[in-house]
Amino acid sequence: MPDVASNSMVDHIHTTLDWVGMSEIHLPARVSDTLAGERPVSTSIQAYVNLANADAKGIHMSRLFLMLEETFGDHSVSAGSIEQLLRNFLQTHEGLSTRGFVQLDFEYSMRRAALKSSYSGWKSYPVSIKGTLCEDGMRIELSVEVPYSSTCPCSAALSRQLIQEQFRKDFEESKVDTDAVLEWLGTEEGILATPHSQRSIAQVRVLLDHNVGDAFPITALIDSIEGALKTPVQTAVKRVDEQEFALLNGQNLMFCEDAARRLKTALNPQSCYKDFWLRVNHLESLHAHNAVAIVTKEVEGGYLPIP
């Protein structure tokens, strides 16, 4: 059969292309975590090579697809298996391509304990693993999205002001009695205002050493993010857990700038991450828009703070 990818009766413009390949390839795979071990995941994959030969009509997409099935059907997803996959991409496109790329997107489920009670529940985190093989060598990147709660410091201050004003109004004509104040604090009339809070998303991408080994630090990275922010979204809760969550929100008032600084401070000293890019998104409940902050590790030649 004729090789239409290399020869075609239809004239074409002679030029190179940055990437050619496929997206939305759905394959089952196995991913190993440094703390939780290996588990199956359902992935959506992108796979590309560049077209460096300006005279070539196109690439051999079926070869990429078959190598994906072969690699992740027989091997767990690791830095080593990704690098071998990309080298196979280039070997089967010799004379056509000099760079290869693959990205695996999947939901990573973790069982999370409640804050106070014995309850626990499953929580799902969007995760991406990217591999790029080019003239400069191999790059392995890990990305996660972590939901958390953020309470507005300005709104909290305004709420306190309203409560103070109401307290003065209700008690200005009488001698303050401790029991009366305690009772007043437990009423809706007393605590007549609460600060607005919202579900927020931290998007974090880290550059790993390509010799990271067979397991990825997915759980470790998520734990670092949640530990820095202090207010991760919960799963199953009892009233005691909800009360503790309210306390944590009150103790960790955050603008998006505050959240970004916390994460940068937490990730900077971790040498396992050669570089990082992070974006925090506060899905405002007061406004119809989101509040966003972006920061990088500021490594020379590293990630740019591009939204």
From Swiss-Prot:
Biological process according to GO: tetrahydrofolate biosynthetic process
Enzyme Commission identifier(s): 3.5.4.16
Reactions it catalyzes: GTP + H2O = 7,8-dihydroneopterin 3'-triphosphate + formate + H(+)
GO molecular function: GTP cyclohydrolase I activity
Listed pathway(s): Cofactor biosynthesis; 7,8-dihydroneopterin triphosphate biosynthesis; 7,8-dihydroneopterin triphosphate from GTP: step 1/1
InterPro entries hit by this protein: GTP_cyclohydrolase_FolE2, GTP_cyclohydrolase_FolE2/MptA
Record keywords: Hydrolase
Site (May be catalytically important): C152
Family label: Belongs to the GTP cyclohydrolase IV family.
Free-text function comment from the UniProt entry: Converts GTP to 7,8-dihydroneopterin triphosphate.
Name of this chain's protein: GTP cyclohydrolase FolE2
Species in which this protein is naturally found: Alcanivorax borkumensis (strain ATCC 700651 / DSM 11573 / NCIMB 13689 / SK2)
Organism phylogeny: Bacteria, Pseudomonadati, Pseudomonadota, Gammaproteobacteria, Oceanospirillales
